[in-house]
């Protein structure tokens, strides 16, 4: 039997993910966010060593960091808009995939320019991850717990940012 729905009846929608899925989603989103934020500062520690190993001046070597940060700033709003168009999950998963590939390239790089270009692309992938991160929280958490989700998100950024 088919029932019609009049304008006064509301169709119930799921409010956030059910509990086991919610935990996995929070861990996945949190881990990806942690890696993208952690990679902003991770090179700072080895900058003098990289400068020595690549035979570049410390001022030139800072472009390994600057390239990553500029890529994030340049593309953050674009990836956010792209998430609205094609879906947050697609942008997020593409960002994670590219982040893993560029991390491998960074680890295997044998020259200053290879590392710098890989870090720039890593910055674009980190931008894809972070641009849709907050938007995904409203699908993960029920409306009554969205503040908790934002708090956990902010805590992940604070801890991973040092």
Stretches found by the model and what they are:
Residues 2-162:
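Transmembrane-helix bundle of Major Facilitator Superfamily
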